[in-house]
Amino acid sequence: MAPTDRNPVQVQYYAKGKKTTESSGPAPAPLILIHDGGGTTFAYFTIGRLERDVWAIHSPTFTSAQPWEGGMDGMAKHYIELIEKVAGIKGKILLGGWSLGGYVALTMAHMIASSPASFEISIDGILMMDSPWLVAGRDLPIGTPQPALIGIPDLVRKSLDNCERMLYHWELPQWGRSSGKAFKFSAGNEKFETQPGTVLYRSLKGDWRAVERTVSHELTEQQALQTPPSGPPPAVMLRSVIPAPTKGSSGKPCRVDQFRDELLLGWDGKYNTDMIHAVLEARSHHYDMFNQLYVDEVTETIKEAIQIIETVLPNE
């Protein structure tokens, strides 16, 4: 959906079409989805029923094609204000986003965790839809090709270009060291336990396996000073398994595919080891995740990811 005057816009309603007796209990936490680098939220309107209120936030600067003043941190702060003051949402919520939206969601959660008394919402979990580890633009390998995106509207392309410039120097906020705890949670009709330093991984075939992280994560002194008092909310990653097409014939991966062959999309060893609890494969490349051919499958994967987020607990 192209941006409208409403922001955020409600995409799904929990109780719509339900009998009163079915929806009389506590409503599940609403899911707020943040736009991707193109600035729009059309993809989120293709997702099937998630049995909860779902909202989407588009880029307020989309139609003006202007860069965002204040960068990623300014964007995160403004989107929290939209949730609280415009949508009127309070209490526990889930955040999510595709690509850039995952980074913004993580930044919003970090901002709230750093000063929880300043906000009316708290973050119960994060759904990251193919948000690979962010390599700042200045650190990309020389000759990194652009993705081959066909038929992209001018405003979407300008939004993508603005994001490229915004991410040239920006780095993700840090959450601190791992707690060293084991965790338990449910997925589908199964219950799982993960040991410290492991992540649950589900392939397209539906088989689950524990993946051991290969690199321990250590903080610099400066990063330690920026760590919130609480740990990160649980996150689940959707991982596209196909490399995106690129311009030219170099054969090199584009920006979003720098870590495509890694099961954790580059996050291993670079971030808090407690944050990502599971990775679920998606039958697509990065820019094709919400193709109508896969939307039913993606919807079920998102439901499973949310179930993991909502059931994860330390295994004590």
Swiss-Prot record:
Induction data: Expression is positively regulated by the leucinostatins biosynthesis cluster-specific transcription regulator lcsF.
Top class in the EC scheme: hydrolase
InterPro entries named in the record: AB_hydrolase_1, AB_hydrolase_fold
Pfam families, per the entry: Abhydrolase_6
Pathway: Secondary metabolite biosynthesis
Organism domain of life: Eukaryota
Gene3D superfamilies according to UniProt: alpha/beta hydrolase (3.40.50.1820)
Consequence of gene loss (knockout): Abolishes the production of leucinostatins A and B.
UniProt keyword annotations, A-Z: Hydrolase
EC assignment: 3.1.-.-
Molecular function GO terms recorded: hydrolase activity
Biological role: Probable thioesterase; part of the gene cluster that mediates the biosynthesis of the lipopeptide antibiotics leucinostatins that show extensive biological activities, including antimalarial, antiviral, antibacterial, antifungal, and antitumor activities, as well as phytotoxic.
Family: Belongs to the AMT4 thioesterase family.
Name of the protein in question: Probable thioesterase lcsE
Organism: Purpureocillium lilacinum (Paecilomyces lilacinus)
